[in-house]
A protein has these predicted regions:
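Solvent-exposed, non-transmembrane amphipathic alpha-helical segments
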Residues: 58, 80-81, 88-91, 123, ...
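Conserved kinase catalytic-core segment
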Residues: 109-171
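Conserved ATP-binding subdomain of kinase catalytic cores across diverse folds
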Residues: 1-114, 137-141, 154-155, 162
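C-lobe/activation-segment region of protein kinase-like
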Residues: 163-166, 170-186
């Protein structure tokens, strides 16, 4: 499961992302505030189904112990929407469902790992292998060099942006595993 939070303050648009993610402050049920990178239905390439796939994959990653930022169900109120002055974001929020998906903002110090960063530690190598297996299992074709959705602080990774997981219609030759003989070649 994941916690519900309510958007209380718009900060800014994120610099990357086709789905037009935004950075907002949200309030937990207990009143604590948390910075959240949130996506809403109107900005999704893949309809609201992309947000559902993203939430499912994030919860599964969390349950498997993979390095995923804390996921949230983000609620937006008419008062929050009215407080947003950025016209593009205002348009996005007005045309979206009133619940979106969010991830706890990563702390400063996370960035893209490159070969020039030096050799990975054994711990990072193991995490990279686990993330690769997870992405292969969920058919995530969106984690690639030109899409920085796997970041590191040198000690651990953080994976996010799972909207393109579970999209079996994009996989040539994919067969539902519950059909007799579908896994015969494996």
């Amino acid at each position: 499961m994941f916690d519900s939070v309510e958007a209380v303050r718009f900060d800014r648009e994120m610099s990357n992302g086709r789905t037009k993610p935004i950075l907002i402050n949200c309030e937990r049920i207990n009143g604590d505030e948390v910075e959240v990178v949130a996506k809403f239905s109107f900005g999704c390439d893949n309809s609201p189904n992309g947000l559902i796939r993203e939430a499912l994959a994030a919860m599964l990653a969390k349950d498997l112990g993979l390095p995923v930022p804390e996921p949230f169900l983000v609620s937006i109120t008419p008062e929050f929407i009215a407080s947003v002055e950025n016209q593009a974001v205002l348009h996005l929020l007005k045309n979206s469902n009133k619940h979106g998906f969010g991830s706890h903002k990563l702390p400063d110090g996370f960035g893209v790992w490159t070969a020039s960063s030096g050799r990975m530690s054994k711990k990072l190598e193991q995490e990279a292998l686990e993330v690769f297996a997870f992405d292969a299992w969920l058919t995530n074709a969106d984690r690639r060099i030109k899409n920085p959705n796997l970041l590191t602080d040198g000690r651990s990774f953080a994976i996010f942006d799972h909207e393109y997981t579970l999209m079996t219609d994009l996989n040539l030759g994919w067969q539902p595993p519950w059909i007799q003989g579908a896994l015969a070649g494996f």
